[in-house]
């Protein structure tokens, strides 16, 4: 079979930078799915993307589908011939339809009888005749929330399309994509190189675009180039560039020919908290801030332009002029905000509604303050600081800085708290109350910070559930799933001795008569338990391990985590499978017992050697297990229980539990109940697979 490389490019207006990677990846995934459906073999496939183009390159694509042999079954032999052995009209009609005679048909014998059959050879279709339709279907399935029309064209896409190129090796594939006829014309950079040129071969795409069109079409190459050049530029001025991957991705999506330059701003702006300056540089201008070795912001920034200028100083000056007003705004807001303490802003929180049924932000901070103090008392943190931090927690939302630069909430609260003379614990809690902000973010570690962060999240969870607005489907307007994961992570990762039932009850009490849902506390607990399952699954913990622990309904997250770790370790032991099966058997036996389960073991009724051995082993272990259970050392407890395997196996081998003698039966049931209870101190091991 012959192979050739395929190139498909769509030339467009500037594509949304934050969607560029997703569009390109989806285009490739959709198209390779089409190739697979069409039984077209290929070696590999990659995507390319730049602000004004999406492209895919498929290497060693088969030039035609493989020929197939298709089995076409005809009538049964019994009905294909008459009494004289002549073909019936049905048989002749079937044969004629397949281009053969009845005599040329083969026979197929199955368990249901014998049939006429024709193994027809179907020649594969040429690839070039399939490409356009497959590419169009791949484009039609792209994740485009708001497609647009342009000109008189009825076709819709995320941005207007100007060119389409489909080359199989050197051969131009005829057809249309989004109403644009396939041609060899590829557009270059807007301001450099050739505005357009003819592409002779699919293999020339990257090189020709770079040399003739001054476009680096490979997204990853641009990204790597920008990062390397930015790091070099920062090193030249004795600093280190702050290059977050999300910003790097966005910048790489904005330029076709990246040129990295270094600029500066007035040192007086460094008197403003660096977070505000960084926010405007990164968020508004897409610049990379530069820090010194000590982590202090330098009066410089690195930016990426889309053109090689003969006068880069002019471009640098232009960018410095653009960013200066934003930095001046930050300076003005900071100096203005400093004139008022955070405490003085408390009355203004009464003018901001948190939620109609749950009151204002002032109501919320009052609840957070009380709940944070309650949590601090439970964890040994400073309750006075926790109450103070909770009270001030939302006051920075009323500052000019946060109103203008919203992502600095919490961070500016920390800076203003320090300026106001609040304790360091209160100041840090102002910033850390929102942690974790996203998956993978760190959790607060300081006691006061943990108390405030938990109080804020629990107040929202209980309040929103309390008014009957729990998340439904994918909708989660109050980000309750994130809040729930935050609660669990803070408690687990800091090993805090907190019980969810107590926390929910306290939060509910603080809401007073605001809540209309009588089942709110139960629903919040169930919601948190469901988040536990999702969180551990994301960490790679087996569902059976999670269900085994959930069966015991532990409501202390730190304790829940200890059980998860213990059961995960237990499952790695050689004895675990046999003991899980034995526990399942015990559960089934005990489930059939009517009335209360017997609990007292009479040593005089242990008549079989195997039951005597099991009882002796349990008696030996119980004094060792009791302190382990009391100290939540579940892993060591299960390790000791794993030593029961041989005794349990022998018991089920030799002993008839449901004996005819009622006393013997009840004694054996009591023994099994005792065995099961030891494991249930940790989890329901019978649920392990």
Swiss-Prot record:
Catalyzed chemical reaction(s): tRNA(Gly) + glycine + ATP = glycyl-tRNA(Gly) + AMP + diphosphate
GO cellular component: cytosol
SS bond list: none
Gene3D superfamilies referenced in this protein's UniProt entry, alphabetically: Isoleucyl-tRNA Synthetase, Domain 1 (1.10.730.10)
InterPro entries: DALR_anticod-bd, Gly-tRNA-synth_bsu, Gly-tRNA-synth_heterodimer
Keywords linked to the UniProt accession: Aminoacyl-tRNA synthetase, ATP-binding, Cytoplasm, Ligase, Nucleotide-binding, Protein biosynthesis
SUPFAM superfamilies per UniProt: HD-domain/PDEase-like
Entry's Gene Ontology molecular function annotations: arginine-tRNA ligase activity; ATP binding; glycine-tRNA ligase activity
Places the protein is found: Cytoplasm
EC id: 6.1.1.14
GO BP of this protein: arginyl-tRNA aminoacylation; glycyl-tRNA aminoacylation
Subunit text: Tetramer of two alpha and two beta subunits.
Family recorded in the similarity comment: Belongs to the class-II aminoacyl-tRNA synthetase family.
Protein name (Swiss-Prot/TrEMBL): Glycine--tRNA ligase beta subunit
Gene name of the encoded protein: glyS
């Amino acid at each position: 079979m012959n192979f050739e490389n395929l190139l498909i490019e769509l030339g467009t207006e500037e594509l949304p930078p934050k969607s560029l990677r997703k569009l390109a990846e989806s285009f490739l995934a959709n198209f390779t799915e089409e190739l697979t459906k069409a039984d077209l073999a290929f070696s590999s496939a990659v995507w390319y993307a730049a602000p004004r183009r999406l492209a895919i390159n498929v290497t060693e694509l088969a030039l035609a589908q493989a020929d197939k042999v298709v089995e076409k079954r005809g009538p049964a032999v019994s009905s294909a011939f008459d009494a004289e052995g002549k073909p019936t009209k049905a048989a002749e009609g079937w044969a004629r339809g397949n281009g053969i005679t009845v005599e040329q048909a083969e026979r197929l014998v199955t368990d249901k009888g014998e049939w006429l059959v024709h193994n027809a050879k179907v020649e594969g279709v040429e690839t070039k005749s399939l490409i356009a339709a497959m590419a169009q279907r791949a484009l039609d399935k792209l994740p485009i929330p708001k497609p647009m029309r342009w000109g008189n064209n009825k076709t819709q896409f995320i941005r207007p399309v100007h060119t389409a190129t489909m080359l199989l090796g050197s051969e131009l594939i005829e057809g249309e994509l989004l109403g644009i006829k396939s041609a060899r014309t590829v557009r270059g950079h807007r301001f450099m190189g050739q505005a357009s040129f003819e592409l002779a071969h699919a293999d020339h795409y990257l090189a020709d675009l770079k040399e003739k069109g001054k476009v680096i079409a490979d997204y990853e190459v641009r990204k790597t180039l920008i990062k390397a050049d930015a790091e070099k530029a920062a090193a030249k001025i004795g600093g280190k560039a702050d290059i977050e991957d999300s910003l790097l991705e966005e910048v790489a999506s904005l330029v076709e020919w990246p040129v990295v330059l270094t600029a500066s701003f007035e040192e007086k702006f460094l008197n403003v908290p660096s977070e505000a300056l960084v926010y405007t540089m990164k968020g508004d201008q897409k610049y990379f801030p530069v820090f010194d070795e000590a982590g202090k912001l330098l009066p410089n920034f690195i930016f990426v332009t889309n053109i090689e200028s003969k006068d880069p100083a002019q471009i640098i000056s232009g960018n410095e002029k653009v960013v200066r007003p934003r930095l001046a705004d930050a300076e003005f807001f900071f100096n203005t905000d400093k004139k008022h303490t955070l405490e003085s802003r408390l009355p203004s929180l009464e003018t901001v509604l948190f939620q109609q049924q749950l009151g204002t932000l002032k109501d919320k901070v009052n609840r957070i303050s009380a709940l944070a103090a309650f949590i601090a008392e439970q964890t040994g943190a400073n309750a006075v600081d926790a109450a103070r931090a909770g009270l001030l927690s939302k006051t920075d939302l009323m500052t000019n800085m946060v109103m203008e630069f919203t992502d600095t909430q919490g961070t500016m609260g920390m800076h203003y708290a320090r300026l106001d003379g609040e304790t360091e614990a209160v100041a840090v809690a102002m910033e850390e109350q929102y942690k974790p902000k996203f998956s993978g973010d760190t959790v607060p570690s300081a006691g006061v910070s943990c108390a405030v962060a938990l109080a804020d999240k629990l107040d929202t969870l209980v309040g929103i559930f309390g008014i009957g607005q729990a998340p439904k489907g994918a909708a989660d307007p109050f980000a309750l799933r994130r809040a729930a994961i935050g609660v669990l992570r803070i408690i687990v990762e800091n090993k805090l001795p907190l019980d969810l039932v107590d926390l929910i009850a306290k939060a509910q009490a603080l809401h007073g008569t605001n809540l209309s849902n009588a089942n709110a506390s139960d629903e919040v607990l169930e919601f948190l338990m469901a988040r536990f399952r999702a969180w551990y699954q994301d960490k790679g913990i087996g569902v059976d391990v999670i269900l085994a622990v959930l069966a015991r309904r532990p409501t202390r997250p730190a304790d829940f985590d200890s059980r998860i770790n213990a059961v995960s370790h237990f499952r790695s032991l050689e004895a675990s499978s046999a003991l899980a099966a034995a526990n399942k058997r015990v559960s089934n036996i005990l489930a059939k017992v009517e009335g209360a389960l017997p609990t007292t073991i009479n040593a005089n009724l242990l008549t079989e050697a195997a039951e005597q051995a099991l009882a002796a082993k349990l008696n030996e272990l119980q004094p060792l297990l009791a302190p382990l259970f009391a100290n939540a050392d579940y892993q060591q407890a299960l390790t000791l229980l794993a030593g029961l395997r041989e005794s349990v196996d022998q018991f089920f081998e030799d002993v008839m539990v449901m004996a005819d003698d009622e006393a013997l039966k009840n004694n054996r049931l009591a023994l099994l109940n005792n065995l099961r209870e030891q494991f249930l101190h940790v989890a329901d091991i019978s649920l392990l697979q």
